[in-house]
Amino acid sequence: MTVQAVALPLKRFLLIEQCPDAWLGLDLYLFQDDAVVFYVGQSQLAFARVWEHLLGGFKGHSITGRFVWVNWPRSMNFTIELLSSQDAQFSHLHNDLNAAEQWLIRQRAPCFNVTHNALATAVPATYLPANAKFRRRISLRKLLFEAERAVKAEDIARW
């Protein structure tokens, strides 16, 4: 069964090693917190592209990924939203991937999108800018361990 959208905290996203089959049709993605969208993007496989941003952030190849890591551990509560351009919400755009991405950018005014974003939202002052120095230079393995611990603690608290 293919889903049309999924949203989950970054800490949970990080624990998913392979793209679930149901997510293979998701071709749009958003990095966001409760108040602001940081980035909107598109890819034939949104799951993999989000991972590219995250991994590229360590080397400065992705401003979005770098922003996530300089704001760690707070950023582990960011939401990763994956969408399908084929969803009914994009029918007025004839479910065109490029048009859907552009529409999301215009509607959500993300911080880091430049193209199609005349009114980009400023990064909230409560966050470090993407060009800030890493406060803690640690490995991806260590970050994944921290995410896993946070998820376990959250799950225990729910019970």
Locations of regions flagged by a protein language model:
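Boundary/linker segments flanking structured domains
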Residues: 1-26, 32-38, 44-159
